[in-house]
Amino acid sequence: MSKGKNRGGNRHIRKPQLAQMVIDYFTRHTGEVIDVRNLFRTLGLNTHPGKLMCMDVLDDLVEQDFLIEREPLRYERTGLPTERERRQKEAEERRKLLMEKTYVGRINVRKDFAFLLTENREVGDLFIPKNQLKGAQTGDKVTARIVDWPEGSKNPVGRVTEVLGRSGENEVEMHAILAEFGLPYTYPKNVEEAANQISDKITPADIAEREDFRDVLTFTIDPRDAKDFDDALSFREIKSGKSSNSKLFEIGVHIADVSHYVTEGSIIDKEAIRRGTSVYLVDRTVPMLPERLCNYICSLRPDEDKLTYSVIFEMNEKAEVKRWHLAHTIIRSDRRFAYEEVQALFEARGEASPEDTPTTLPDGEKPWFDTLTEEQKATPLGKLEGALLCLNRLAKLLRERRFLKGAVDFERPEVRFDIDEKGKPLGTYIKVAKDANKLIEEFMLLANRTVAESIGRVPKGKKAKVLPYRIHEQPDQDKLANLSQFVTKFGHKLKYTGTPAEISKNLNKLLHDVHGSKEQNLVEMVALRAMMKARYSIVNVGHYGLAFDYYTHFTSPIRRYPDLMVHRLLSRYAEGGRSANPEKYEALCDLSSENEQTAALAERASIKYKQVEFMADKIGKIFEGIISGVTEFGLYVELNDSHCEGMIPLRDMDDDYYEFDERNYQLWGKRHHRRFTLGDPIRVRVAKANLDKKQLDFALVTEK
């Protein structure tokens, strides 16, 4: 009787269950060689089918590298984890990583405890004991850390690390965005003190070792509200060429010599590495360098002697560079321009590009070129108009040549805000790059490309010295194929094979063809996604988007750390120094790329917050818009007047049962057959403005 019972004792065991029993057994006996007969006996496998199943399990585990067969029928665990162990370890590591992060949210205090309401889906809301609130009250915005995450618990336990202030206040919300992305909003006291110790005096010795451009016509062109002037241009006609009709110009691209003041390895330098870049939120700049340096000592302010690192070009009327050299210089800017002031000159003299919309100067401001006195016209100020017009013509030639070579023309409109002194958004507008912007852009690109080529281009067989390059790899062929297939939905074509220049030409034609169409935003977005992200690396692969074989960042050391690295290395190599440590600089390049991406995310979050804030007092109002995106979750709509974007959730479109047509990017109603297609005009009502989520919800306005 017992014999019969044993014979069928494990006939109901299943293979997954047996596999786990075998894994557990070998895990307990790691380091031991196990005979299968002992294994059968221990696991109670006394039937032939059970033993055969066990042998199958052992074979599987050998294939998975969990076991190794030391000799026939004798096995040992390899030490490699099982799939279950790997998943558990990954989950533990992920949990550990989450516990090291800082979380931002709004506090909700109850009788005996509190919750931090976060928008982080991985951790949800944090349970905060009363004794860990640090004085926070309901409605406060705070930062917090996780201190415990009990197994199986829905909410991790946290503690408040800083009370930022009341939710909804501009200063608090901007600090919250910075904290959300791990970005600093104040400078450590010791760094500020170190900056205050730096002298702004320029000594005779400083001047003696530099080329002196203080008597050469020099100016800056920047946004109206800028304070950190990284770059200046100087201009003079130096001589006529061989023919009487040919002219030669000396154009200096002068960049703030930050490396003169910030020494490598100093406390200021270490903080700059940590930040990597200045961060531009809607209402403020969070600078990479302390204010004394970025806005005062290094900033190329007018009528002040400033130390610069410069690329000096000799260029003819065809914008061909005949000679150039790199030099440490001293300059004295004659005039600080806003972009609008320079653009107004181009428009007044008929030199603006046809596509540029007319520029409006602030109320009461007269064009600078119409206000010069006779006395001023006899000074360098009187030569500014001619210099700017000449530089504009040269910049257009440089730009035209760049696009003929294969540069890709991605110019996406950017939403900007008019804000009051308290940071409240009063209105929105679209930032558009015009000729004045492009003038500066082209000469900065020329300087960046030139210094990169001077280090990177070496004779065959020689190795180039280490330099951080700004690289942009060629787009992935599979993504281009997907883009080509995608645009056929709208009647467009994209040939994605050929040389890089041919592909770029085809991309530019596509972008030109969709300009002004209802599908423009979506096609541009999908095309951008087909592109690789530009980044920093010491391994040069060129810059696809700009069509440059060599490119770096040299022109903005006040606000970008890679530019400061490039300045130091150029100075080192000019003095005959050896090539820098590649591992060190590649690590700094990786960190700079990460910091750049983080800053961009914070900047976008601040724009989204201000859009929602701008619409918060317009709940219930009706607006005209364009469908800017169609998904299975609903419709994205961009309002015509404010350019704010929100969503009509599919769950709220209850007048019909709508299905998502992915092929044609539209929602269509099964009963009434109404269709909503990308680019369609639409009327919406503002339904919700959730500042915590930075989210606008619209409701569809149905026509009666």
Regions found by a protein language model. Name each.
Residues 110, 239-240, 315-320, 419-423:
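Short acidic-glycine loop/turn motifs at beta-strand connectors
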Residues 339, 358-641, 647-654, 658-665, ...:
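Append "with occasional cross-activation on large, charged helical scaffolds in nucleic-acid assemblies
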Residues 2-252, 259-305, 336-337, 341-346, ...:
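Charge-lined substrate channels and their catalytic hotspots, especially those that engage the 3′ end
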Residues 66, 141, 320, 622, ...:
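Residue-level marker of beta-strand positions
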Residues 144, 630, 684-686:
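A generic structural signal for residues embedded in beta-strands
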Residues 285-345, 390, 526-528, 541, ...:
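Covalent nucleotidyltransferase
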Residues 667-704:
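In a subset of proteins, long, contiguous C-terminal domains/tails are tracked
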